[in-house]
Amino acid sequence: KTFFNQEAHIYYFLGCLYEQQEENAKAETAYKSAAVYKAAVSEISLFRALALKKLGRAEEAQRVLDEMLSVAENFIVNKDLRSYFGVGSPSPMPFEYDIEKNNMVDGNVLKAFALLGLDEREKAAAAINKARELSPYDFRIYIFDSLINQDVIYV
């Protein structure tokens, strides 16, 4: 296990399940685990923000979502620049060298997840559709599609 492992989605949904069972102490523990800061910003950061909201830490949640939007916009604006490749960082496969396409997909997917956390569904759908045009089989798009109408996302 490394510091970069992101498990917020697992703990967030576990917290939701405990909440449904009215096991509030266990739900709070799960939400606290989901709210732990991880160094990498990704779509999974949405679940950290949602957990922070559940814990009554709305300002922190807003900062997480704002950071997601900032990183997403950076991908989109600087679509022709490669990201830093360090240990544990994602790196393209040999057949994924269209860096502009990759950055546009990554930026729009991340933006969509952040907007989902802000309950801006129409803007989120528009962002995910831009990504879908470029990479229709990206797994993150399927995840987004399964989340957009789930009540557990809107805290």
Where are the predicted features?
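"A position-specific structural signal for the A-helix of alpha-solenoid helical repeats
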Residues: 6, 12-13, 47-49, 54, ...
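Flexible helix-coil transition and linker loops at the boundaries of alpha-helical arrays
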Residues: 1-4, 94-100
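Alpha-helical junction/boundary sensor with strong preference for TPR arrays
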Residues: 1, 37-38, 72-79, 135
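Residue-level recognition of tetratricopeptide repeat
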Residues: 7, 41, 58, 75, ...
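Residue signature of alpha-solenoid helical repeat architecture, marking inter-repeat boundaries
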Residues: 5, 39-41, 46, 102-104, ...
